[in-house]
Swiss-Prot record:
Similarity comment: family membership: Belongs to the SlyX family.
InterPro entries: SlyX
Cystine bridges: none
Protein name: Protein SlyX homolog
């Protein structure tokens, strides 16, 4: 294999590696956005659950209805 062929081969590999790195970066960015969205949804669900628990606790604190 001549020096020129080796250089051409290395340049080709470098180009493929650059494409692969860019594709991996795109996937990573998309995953990070998805994680951030899920974190926001989880926080909203936790807040909603705490509100529901608070409503249930206040319901339990009410005096029981009179019985006949």
């Amino acid at each position: 294999m001549s020096l020129q062929e080796r250089v051409t081969d290395l340049e080709s590999r470098l180009a493929f590696q650059d494409d692969t790195i860019q594709a991996l970066n795109d996937v990573l960015v998309a995953q990070q956005r998805a994680v951030e969205r899920l974190q926001l949804q989880m926080a909203a669900l936790l807040k909603r659950q705490e509100e529901m628990v608070g409503q249930f606790e206040s319901f339990e604190e009410e005096a029981p209805p009179p019985h006949y």
